Amino acid sequence: MKIYFIVNPMSGQGKAYRTIEKKLEEADFEYEIYLTTASHDATRFVKEKCEEHAGETVRFIACGGDGTLNEVANGAVGFENAEISCCPCGSGNDFVKYYGGADRFSDPKTVATAPVQKIDLIKIGDKYSINVVHFGFDTQVLRTMLKVKHMKLIGGKNAYNTGVVSAVLTGMKNKGKLYADGELLNEDGKFLLCTAANCSHIGGKFYCAPKAENNDGMIDVCAVKPISRFRLMNLINAYEKGEHLDDPRFEKIVKYRRCKKFTVEAPDGFCISIDGELTALNKFTCEIVPAAISFAVPAVNAESKDAQKEELHT
């Protein structure tokens, strides 16, 4: 088996490469480290190596954030000889929260030899999501965070709060019709936020899809109706904790569906997030692709924080 560690050199405040290299010093298997050079470079690299080693299993380990993992997944999909996994080095690392957190994937030697399981992907046009597609209020938060993250005072550790303030001012009412397997979820064509989930977390800490399973052949769609700013402030902590599907305060404002196809029609268009990467669209369809890719999942380390949590996804 060929093993490639695909490192985003900008991740981990520029320390991702040194971190991975040091952890691999005593590795007893052959591997190569590849440093990405531009956006979508990881996708290109994965495709090329899958074709080059067509008769051999090739494992690609994304060392960066959710964006790097997304690029690796997009390169590997469609190749029977491809396996992927990750060593999270980004800031949010939302995808691995589905498996309990980054600790489980922190040792590259363990990740390189972990068993694989088939997981689903969400297809959006010619792109794929391994985690969550989302848009509306929370995408406005993300959009602002990306703009200000390197600025003094309002950026850095304050970037999230700056994003929330911006979204509260400009992202409370969004327009677009939402269809889950043909069912219209919002007759008035308005919504606060919406997620189409394969896994469970977005935005670094929001447990947006607590019932999602990434191997059940279904998309978990959650649409929230527009509400007042005051009500949002009262409910946002419960949404962050993943309580919105059972909390009676959300009963009249949340539409939750499990579907195979989810369509959005927004004549004016807006930004959507595909695993944390923003793109502008006005009409798109998300379709589940069952068992689309082989993903390596290490066992829970008894000494890690993951061992303190219930192991739901094995």
Residue ranges and their predicted role:
Residues 4-6, 12, 36, 78-193:
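Catalytic core of DAGKc-family lipid kinases
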Residues 7, 64, 225:
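Short beta-strand/turn micro-motifs composed of small residues
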Residues 12-16, 203-204, 295:
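Short N-terminal binding/cap micro-motifs at the start of the first secondary-structure element
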Residues 180-184, 213, 223-314:
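ATP/nucleoside-binding phosphotransfer catalytic cores, i.e., glycine-rich phosphate-binding loops
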Residues 68-81:
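Short Gly/Thr/Asp-enriched flexible loops that form oxyanion-binding sites at enzyme active sites
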Residues 149-159, 210-230:
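Gly/Ser/Thr-rich active-site loops/lids in small-molecule metabolic enzymes
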Residues 1-60, 70, 302, 309-314:
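ATP/NTP phosphate-donor binding region
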Residues 134, 138, 193-210, 278:
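Glycine-rich phosphate/pyrophosphate-binding beta-alpha loops
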